[in-house]
Amino acid sequence: MPMFIVNTNVPRASVPDGFLSELTQQLAQATGKPPQYIAVHVVPDQLMAFGGSSEPCALCSLHSIGKIGGAQNRSYSKLLCGLLAERLRISPDRVYINYYDMNAANVGWNNSTFA
């Protein structure tokens, strides 16, 4: 159930076609979870500043049941910052990513939970 959310001040017109699909495939590979369970939400055109500057930036979160922890998070950061830099032209030093290890009982899906 990994869920990756990107809030960014990059305009919608600058988000390339296929970006959501690329994020889905890359996260599936990185987490080892099936792509059909990966959710991606990109929220462009936000009023945002990072370090007092309105240059392109992103505030992100990755939620997952398991597969969250020190070494894994560093790997995800490298992957996700790289994709944001390459596709949205956001410098990695203008990106924060918060990681959340979710309890399966606290994640609802398909009329139930993952517990």
Curated annotation (Swiss-Prot):
Any GO molecular function: chemoattractant activity
Quaternary structure annotation from Swiss-Prot or TrEMBL: Homotrimer. Interacts with CXCR2 extracellular domain. Interacts with the CD74 extracellular domain, USO1, COPS5 and BNIPL.
Gene Ontology biological process terms in this record: carboxylic acid metabolic process; cell surface receptor signaling pathway; cellular senescence; DNA damage response, signal transduction by p53 class mediator; inflammatory response; innate immune response; negative regulation of apoptotic process; negative regulation of cell migration
EC code(s) of this entry: 5.3.2.1, 5.3.3.12
Keyword DNA-binding attributed: no
Protein name per its UniProtKB record: Macrophage migration inhibitory factor
Disorder noted: Rheumatoid arthritis systemic juvenile: An inflammatory articular disorder with systemic onset beginning before the age of 16. It represents a subgroup of juvenile arthritis associated with severe extraarticular features and occasionally fatal complications. During active phases of the disorder, patients display a typical daily spiking fever, an evanescent macular rash, lymphadenopathy, hepatosplenomegaly, serositis, myalgia and arthritis.
Keyword Ribonucleoprotein: no
Provenance organism: Homo sapiens
Top-level lineage group: Eukaryota
Principal EC category: isomerase
UniProt keyword annotations, A-Z: Acetylation, Cytokine, Cytoplasm, Immunity, Inflammatory response, Innate immunity, Isomerase, Secreted
GO terms for cellular component: cell surface; cytoplasm; cytosol; extracellular exosome; extracellular region; extracellular space; ficolin-1-rich granule lumen; nucleoplasm
In-chain residues carrying the UniProt-annotated modification N6-succinyllysine: K78
Compartments (UniProt record): Secreted; Cytoplasm
Modified residues (N6-acetyllysine): K78
Residues that bind substrate: K33, I65, N98
Disulfide partners: none
Record InterPro entries: Macrophage_inhib_fac (IPR001398), Macrophage_inhib_fac_CS (IPR019829), Tautomerase/MIF_sf (IPR014347)
Biological role stated in the UniProt entry: Pro-inflammatory cytokine involved in the innate immune response to bacterial pathogens. The expression of MIF at sites of inflammation suggests a role as mediator in regulating the function of macrophages in host defense. Counteracts the anti-inflammatory activity of glucocorticoids. Has phenylpyruvate tautomerase and dopachrome tautomerase activity (in vitro), but the physiological substrate is not known. It is not clear whether the tautomerase activity has any physiological relevance, and whether it is important for cytokine activity.
Name of the coding gene: MIF
Miscellaneous comment as given in the Swiss-Prot or TrEMBL entry: Serum levels of MIF are elevated in patients with severe sepsis or septic shock. High levels of MIF are correlated with low survival. Drugs that inhibit tautomerase activity protect against death due to sepsis.
Induction remarks: Up-regulated in concanavalin-A-treated lymphocytes. Up-regulated in macrophages upon exposure to M.tuberculosis antigens.
Entry similarity comment: Belongs to the MIF family.
Catalytic reaction annotation: 3-phenylpyruvate = enol-phenylpyruvate; L-dopachrome = 5,6-dihydroxyindole-2-carboxylate
Active-site residues (renumbered): P2
